[in-house]
UniProtKB/Swiss-Prot annotation:
Domain of life: Eukaryota
Keyword DNA damage: no
A cellular-component GO term for this protein: cytosol
Keywords, ordered alphabetically: Cytoplasm, Nucleus, Protein biosynthesis, Repeat, RNA-binding
Ranges for region Disordered: 239-285
PANTHER family tied to this protein: SIMILAR TO HUMAN CHROMOSOME 6 OPEN READING FRAME 52 (PTHR37457:SF1), TRNA SELENOCYSTEINE 1-ASSOCIATED PROTEIN 1-RELATED (PTHR37457)
Gene Ontology biological process terms from the UniProt entry: mRNA splice site recognition; translation
Protein name per the record: tRNA selenocysteine 1-associated protein 1-like
Location, primary (coarse class): nucleus
Record's function text: Involved in the early steps of selenocysteine biosynthesis and tRNA(Sec) charging to the later steps resulting in the cotranslational incorporation of selenocysteine into selenoproteins.
Family annotation (InterPro entries): Nucleotide-bd_a/b_plait_sf, RBD_domain_sf, RRM_dom, SECp43_RRM2, TSAP1, TSAP1_C
Amino acid sequence: MFNRMTSLWMGDLDPYMDENFIKQAFSTMGETAFGVKIITHRVTGGSAGYCFVEMADEASVDRCVQRLNGKLVPGSNPPRKFKLNYATYGKRPEPGPEFSVFVGDLTSEVDDYQLHQFFLKKFPSCKGAKVVTDPYGNSRGYGFVKFSDENEQKKALEEFQNASGLGGKPIRISIAVNKGNKASTYHNQNNTYNTNYQQQYYRQPYNSYYPQWGYDQYSGYNYGYNPYAAPPPMMGPPPPMGMPPMPPDMQGSTEAHDGTEEVEEDPSEDPNPQVDVEELNRQYMERSEELYDSLMECHWLPMDTITSDISMMNGS
């Protein structure tokens, strides 16, 4: 009998992924799976595409969710990424205000777990962290950290700027900026923020910043079935028991399993992009030269006065 408090939900399984394969995958990643229960389809008897994995304790569950999510499953062909969640709804993070920061200049070895632990040691309200990855699971060099306490978010902006100890080089940090609100003003240096910006920012759903975090990555699953009952054909497997229903516009969608998984581009961006001044100057000069050449090649002659007759020109 599985203990849900010490178990993981794992999705996006291919038919060949049996208990031994999953145990070996966790072992390769440095974790020990004590048991695997693959959920089967009630009619066909085949895999329903998800399973439950029992770990040693709750700390191991937390670590796996943070450290392995989004990484490639060892030995998977076609390549698959770990899609993990808590096996019990009670482990879902509590609702409430969330305040995020952008963290840049992350070296390739930094993962979600390391990023979270780096901030958690100093700021107890740190609720989680996400390193943004490409479709192959490689780090893009930046991520996001969220807090439940706004004061600790502001302290992190001050105290962790150019901080060392996470990866191979100092990190840079700023308030998280969503592309939809890029025009909103803020002043990071003296921690004064535009009031309208804050009101808009704190109401934004966090799936804009963390498309692979928490339960949103499984939002397409149908919630009307018991987790141990097989879903109907063309439906994805359900999430852990007790998950509340999603809005109508998010129900009925399914995830791709064609081997070339389409990954939605993260809508967040680096708030301090590097500007190539030489390239911008070169483009400006090219546009200026094109305008000059167009004027020089024009065959119209200037008029003496506004009432002058326009002379006819014979083409050469």
